[in-house]
């Protein structure tokens, strides 16, 4: 009986792992996008302080604010 219980737990954990695989990939893609966004925000701050390149800043802000979750996550982590 204990062996059946252990086997059921193993099968349940494997099934749970495989069923959440897509969510994990989406999360990984989101993390990569956030990293790119974070780099662009840093570039944005650099150019704002150094050269005032308005066209560059507008394109950077548009990219980052399109993914509002990412943008807010990065900005709140700085505080």
Curated annotation (Swiss-Prot):
Keywords: Disulfide bond, Secreted, Signal, Toxin. The keyword Nucleus does not apply. GO terms for cellular component: extracellular region. GO terms for molecular function: toxin activity. It comes from the Eukaryota. Belongs to the scoloptoxin-03 family. This is U-scoloptoxin(03)-Sa1a.
């Amino acid at each position: 009986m204990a062996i059946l219980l252990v086997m059921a737990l193993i099968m349940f954990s494997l099934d749970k792992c495989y069923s959440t695989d897509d969510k994990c990939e989406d999360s990984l893609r989101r993390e990569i996008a956030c990293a790119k966004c974070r780099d662009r925000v840093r570039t944005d701050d650099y150019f704002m302080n150094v050269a005032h390149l308005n066209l560059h800043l507008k394109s950077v802000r548009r990219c980052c604010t399109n993914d509002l979750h990412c943008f807010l996550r990065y900005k709140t982590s700085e505080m």
